[in-house]
């Protein structure tokens, strides 16, 4: 059994993949980025954002100090990119990003190993601050309270998962040491955490309507390049290269939570489905991607360890955890049906990242992934 320690991957045992709270703003030198990122919702609503971006000075990102400042800068710059591209809706997108955004975004992305595009790591993991057990959203996309609620609930799901850090570590350590009781207690706690993730996800209904998500939030998460994209030829990052670049859209599918559970519980998918999930990993912070690779490549998988013990208690705890995960994935399919399939009022809904890989069988894909989960029951 490999030795996997969460801390090695910058994953907290209290808040998981969320970034530890950081300053809301960058130092004074970066005030133009602070200002534009904060005023994005109002300036997009009044159609003044693009002009404001064009007037922004070209700043030197090498003046950013340390990892967390760079993550905040990345968040600000991808928000500015999103507002700039989609201010006039999907029909009025532009195909070139001005140098004052593209150059520092490109460079800071290279430093961080992140893609130069809006990702879940930005709008959720960096943007959602844990405060007194709740989530506070620092920067908003256009759309007011409904959009902020979407971002907040994503943060609440991550936080619910994040609290299972010790449980996950107990499963891994217990498996390594053949400690049945430790593993069983890990599974039991993890089952509760997955239930809490579902409770958090259900809160989407409180303040987000399907129409608002589909028409108000989703367009700002669009990627570029590929037949399904409003910018089908890709985006030119001025001052970086004249060759258009292709990126898939931002999506909570870029959350590492479900892929961690897949790796931990030994759930496998067909090569075609795994190819999409692997592609998604390229849009995660490198240390999280590494954790998924190490979990996936564990030589002795957790279900194998459980089976070998022939221990009824442990098997029951493992199966309970798998059942909770199946239920969570089923619930997530209901959410996708409500917010994307029904809201689109069409046979070919514009999904998030999945459509950018040229596929349209969204619900069958999610159902198969859910059914693969069930198969590891013992
Ligand atoms: C309004 C709420 C949501 C909608 C409309 C939604 C939509 C989608 C869609 C369309 C996909 C397919 C891949 C894609 O096209 O991007 C997907 C997959 C996925 N979503 Fe969501 N999602 C929502 C909330 C969440 C939240 C809050 C999380 C976790 C924080 C999450 C985690 C995932 C994961 C991990 C996948 C990959 C498939 C899997 O492993 O089962 N989603 N979602």
From Swiss-Prot:
Heme binds at residue 332. One of its GO terms (biological process) is 'de novo' NAD biosynthetic process from L-tryptophan. Keywords: Heme, Iron, Metal-binding, Oxygen transport, Transport. Binds 1 heme group per subunit. GO terms for molecular function: heme binding; indoleamine 2,3-dioxygenase activity; metal ion binding; oxygen carrier activity; tryptophan 2,3-dioxygenase activity. InterPro entries: Indolamine_dOase, Trp/Indoleamine_2_3_dOase-like. GO terms for cellular component: cytoplasm. Gene3D superfamilies: 1.20.58.480. SUPFAM superfamilies: Indolic compounds 2,3-dioxygenase-like (SSF140959). It holds the Pfam family IDO. The keyword Metal-binding applies. Its cofactor is heme. Homodimer. Belongs to the indoleamine 2,3-dioxygenase family. Serves a reserve supply of oxygen and facilitates the movement of oxygen within muscles. This is Myoglobin. It comes from Haliotis madaka. The lineage of its organism: Eukaryota, Metazoa, Spiralia, Lophotrochozoa, Mollusca.
């Amino acid at each position: 059994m490999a030795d996997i320690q969460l801390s090695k991957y910058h994953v907290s045992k209290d808040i998981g993949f969320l970034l530890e709270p950081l300053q809301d703003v960058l130092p004074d030198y970066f005030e133009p980025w602070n200002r534009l990122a904060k005023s994005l919702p109002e300036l997009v609503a009044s159609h003044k954002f693009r002009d404001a971006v064009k007037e922004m000075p070209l700043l030197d990102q090498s003046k950013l100090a340390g990892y967390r400042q760079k993550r905040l800068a990345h968040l600000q710059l991808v928000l500015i990119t999103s507002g700039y591209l989609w201010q006039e809706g999907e029909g009025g997108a532009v195909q070139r990003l001005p140098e004052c955004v593209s150059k520092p975004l490109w460079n800071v992305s290279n430093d961080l190993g992140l893609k130069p595009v809006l990702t879940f790591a930005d709008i959720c993991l960096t943007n959602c601050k844990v405060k007194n057990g709740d989530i506070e959203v620092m920067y908003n996309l256009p759309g007011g309270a409904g959009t902020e609620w979407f971002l907040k609930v994503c943060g609440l799901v991550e936080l619910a998962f994040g609290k299972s850090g010790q449980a996950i570590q107990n499963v891994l350590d217990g498996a390594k040491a053949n400690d049945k009781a430790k593993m069983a207690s890990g599974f039991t706690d993890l089952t509760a955490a997955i239930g809490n993730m579902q409770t958090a996800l259900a809160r989407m209904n409180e303040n987000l309507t399907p129409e608002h998500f589909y028409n108000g939030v989703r367009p700002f998460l669009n990627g570029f390049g590929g037949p399904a994209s409003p910018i089908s030829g890709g985006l030119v990052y001025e001052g970086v290269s004249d060759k258009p670049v292709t990126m898939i859209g931002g999506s909570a599918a870029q959350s590492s939570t479900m892929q961690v559970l897949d790796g931990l519980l030994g759930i496998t998918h067909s090569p075609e489905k795994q190819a999409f999930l692997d592609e998604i990993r390229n849009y995660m912070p490198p240390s999280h991607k590494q954790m998924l690779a190490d979990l996936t490549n564990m030589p002795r998988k957790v279900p194998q360890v459980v089976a070998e013990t022939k221990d009824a208690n442990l098997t029951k705890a493992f199966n309970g955890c798998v059942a909770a995960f199946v239920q969570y994935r089923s619930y997530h399919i209901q959410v996708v049906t409500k917010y994307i399939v029904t809201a689109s009022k069409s046979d070919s809904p514009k999904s998030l990242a999945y459509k950018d890989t040229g596929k349209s069988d969204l619900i069958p894909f999610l159902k198969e992934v859910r059914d693969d989960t069930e198969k590891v029951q013992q």
